[in-house]
C-alpha cells in the first residue's frame, strides 16, 4: 500500500468516525394506527432508546420506546390493551415486520461504501 493510499484510508476512517457516532438517534418503525403493515420510519428522541413491537390480536404496534418502560404493565396500560405480546430492541429498525437481520440501514451503507471505494482505489 502506498503512502498516498494510507493517507486516503486514514481520512476516510476519520470521516466515518465523525459521521457515525454512537449517540446518534435510534431509528424505529412507527405506525400511527396499529397495523401489521408498517413502513414508516422515524428517528427517536434521545429519551426513547428502544424500539417496541407489541401485538394484541390483529393489532400490531410499532414505535419508539423507553427501554426502562419495557414491561408488560407499563405497555399494556399505555396502549390500553389487556392481553399482548411485546418485544423491545435497541438496534436501528429492529421492530420491523419479520425482521430477519438482513436489512441494510443507512449507517451500514455509510460505513461500507467508503471502505469499498478506498479498497477499489488502492487496487487500481
From Swiss-Prot:
A lipid is attached at residue 101 (GPI-anchor amidated glycine). The keyword Transport does not apply. One of its GO terms (biological process) is negative regulation of activation of membrane attack complex. It holds the Pfam family CD59. SUPFAM superfamilies: Snake toxin-like. The gene is CD59. Interacts with T-cell surface antigen CD2. The lineage of its organism: Eukaryota, Metazoa, Chordata, Craniata, Vertebrata. Glycans are attached at residue 37. It comes from Oryctolagus cuniculus. The keyword Secreted applies. This is CD59 glycoprotein. One of its GO terms (cellular component) is side of membrane. Keywords: Cell membrane, Disulfide bond, Glycoprotein, GPI-anchor, Lipoprotein, Membrane, Secreted, Signal. Disulfide bonds join 28-51, 31-38, 44-64, 70-88, 89-94. InterPro entries: CD59, LY6_UPA_recep-like, Snake_toxin-like_sf. Residues 102-124 form a propeptide.
